[in-house]
Amino acid sequence: MANLVLSECGIRPLPRIYTTPRSNFLSNNNKFRPSLSSSSYKTSSSPLSFGLNSRDGFTRNWALNVSTPLTTPIFEESPLEEDNKQRFDPGAPPPFNLADIRAAIPKHCWVKNPWKSLSYVVRDVAIVFALAAGAAYLNNWIVWPLYWLAQGTMFWALFVLGHDCGHGSFSNDPKLNSVVGHLLHSSILVPYHGWRISHRTHHQNHGHVENDESWHPMSEKIYNTLDKPTRFFRFTLPLVMLAYPFYLWARSPGKKGSHYHPDSDLFLPKERKDVLTSTACWTAMAALLVCLNFTIGPIQMLKLYGIPYWINVMWLDFVTYLHHHGHEDKLPWYRGKEWSYLRGGLTTLDRDYGLINNIHHDIGTHVIHHLFPQIPHYHLVEATEAAKPVLGKYYREPDKSGPLPLHLLEILAKSIKEDHYVSDEGEVVYYKADPNLYGEVKVRAD
């Protein structure tokens, strides 16, 4: 009887030049050699084979011989090779330019709607007055702490809207921006034009060690000139979160001038009138607060305005600090030829503030805001999503927040303890820690 094998069409004879399988169908042996010699046929002793004596006297084995297919060896990369491939240098020049990011952002994200912007002002101002009226009416010590937190957060929201006026993202009308900006910022004791101009300097020089204006690093030389009380204030929580009013008066260590004085080196001669106007508005607001102290009493003013004002200051310092510090990876600061507007802007960070995102007008979408401050706040989330594919690893996805951004407190504390100064030399530098500031602190590896 001829050996039979299955074909696509049915059963066909197995050619005599091939030996029949010598193992059962559970075998993984595929040493299957052609032979022309009848001596290659041997009787199978497999219990699963079906032997029949052929006319030649040889036993045919019809066992199913299944073997694994031939596989190509897989060469795994060593952990070191994989690490080199995955390693990302945030200080390296990006493979894209500002125009690439701009092109990825939908055109409607650049459109400013003054009526929509004004609607946010009306909403926030109405909430501020409603909170004050409710707290004054209820006037008990269960309500007051809740009021302070809520009202301080709303003062901070007013600051963000005034901040949009300063950038021109509120509307295309400079006069409208100026009027609304003065009303909002003066109400929380911020000199609108003085701050607007210094904040413009911050955006134009973001990420530059010497030329940046807000929360920029101190060089080691300047750090070593600070007296102990200044160091303690600057690197101790919560004191550092109360820094903003002092910054307005005297700027940061290593810089001179004031946001209130028209002759400060912050300003150009042509900006003198603007600075005087804002300082006059600030003075008028301060005078109004003094009058209210005599009208309703200093204790009531402290409860209604004073404590919420300082909560607002803490929000401002908390948010602005974390937009430039505290990432788990060390981020570079630049000098000289290594600095560019794009590279400096890419060192900023987005943050998620949970329920507060909507209240403070999505200020946490900070990367795109820093690169393109003309985009209105109500388009920043969409613009950020559109830009992510271009930014790639240069965009650092923020940690998701719960209802309140409590996760950021640990990040803030860690950064305050570790980010003290940068080297006096070098065009790409990173923060270092002073091991003697608090005694023993863990210093980041360079």
Swiss-Prot record:
Its main location: plastid. It is a multi-pass membrane protein. The chain crosses the membrane at residues 118-138, 141-161, 231-250, 279-299, 302-322. A motif (Histidine box-1) lies at residues 163-167. A motif (Histidine box-2) lies at residues 199-203. Most abundant in leaves and seedlings. Belongs to the fatty acid desaturase type 1 family. This is sn-2 acyl-lipid omega-3 desaturase (ferredoxin), chloroplastic. It comes from Arabidopsis thaliana (Mouse-ear cress). The lineage of its organism: Eukaryota, Viridiplantae, Streptophyta, Embryophyta, Tracheophyta. The gene is FAD7.
